[in-house]
């Protein structure tokens, strides 16, 4: 396994944001529903995307991925998704429902992904059963068989799960009758998935609200679609520029997708100027502590919690960050403490006492966003930091070394 060697740097300049990983993956899973030619543009070249493409190839789709464009043709033929692919990421489970819709059955292993606490597929399975599927779990495998769906089905999610909302919305698109998802997740990536499916002839409305209504259609057409920008990547670079005391533009983004982050940065002493499709961040000022509640969208995203903790670790005063989405998402704190941060966790709340400096050392990333946060910590720390378990970041950040270097950051990828 490789690692990143990171040195103290002030980030300055402009960074162009890639397409959203968390849109591209469910959109690619949804291509199972169409046998026509599809072109998906602005797809980031990431390990997770490569894994999803390999899954689609294994089940029969013809896929070409070049220059951030995925071209797909053909129908699915194989209802079994291999364990060695599914174990690599959670989003792979989203092929289970669509595959069973087309072939009448599917067999998918329970998924892997980031180790950040309990992320059960229970909500997915509950919803699939509501849609009339028979679901059995044996020896880590999920067997799904298509049954008879009622004309009108209401699925009330116990928690606004992004993955379950996307999975059930996609699955219901080609199922007869009406499906209503209550307490749906509201993330922009769900709106993007709805727009993609509707561009092919689906009849879905309400994405972006707590209630999504799907009127089943018989088939989906082909077409072209462009994935939205990655708001989490945008937020990561905005926090990195601010934390290092630099200045720069986050470009080719949809600023309203990160309104809560811009507010937090402003309140803590970072200057933020919002333009049409880019945001200017000036982190030269002194930073102040703040309290943050991590919540589903439109609240502060859990996928930016590790990064904002690094930023707050050098802010004056005390900050409290309450994690309400993934209660165990604090594995990065031990590594930050080793670098000199003063952070402790009490009942799902990170209490941060700002310090004057962090010091470089060897650290290990435990998941995608935690590893990105440790790279930011390496940029603000004195000396050199080695961030190990590079594969985590390669799952979710396209060209991260090149982009940080373009901002005048000192980083090297040792393979």
UniProtKB/Swiss-Prot annotation:
The keyword Cell cycle applies. UDP-N-acetyl-alpha-D-glucosamine binds at residues 90, 303, 325. Pathway: Cell wall biogenesis; peptidoglycan biosynthesis. GO terms for biological process: cell division; cell wall organization; peptidoglycan biosynthetic process; regulation of cell shape; UDP-N-acetylgalactosamine biosynthetic process. Its main location: cytoplasm. The keyword Hydrolase does not apply. GO terms for cellular component: cytoplasm. It catalyses: phosphoenolpyruvate + UDP-N-acetyl-alpha-D-glucosamine = UDP-N-acetyl-3-O-(1-carboxyvinyl)-alpha-D-glucosamine + phosphate. Phosphoenolpyruvate binds at residues 21-22. Transmembrane segments: none annotated. It is an enzyme of class 2 (transferase). Its EC number is 2.5.1.7. InterPro entries: Enolpyruvate_Tfrase_dom, Enolpyruvate_Tfrase_sf, MurA_subfamily, RNA3'P_cycl/enolpyr_Trfase_a/b, UDP_GlcNAc_COvinyl_MurA. The active site is at residue 114. It is found in: Cytoplasm. Belongs to the EPSP synthase family. MurA subfamily. HAMAP family: MurA. This is UDP-N-acetylglucosamine 1-carboxyvinyltransferase.
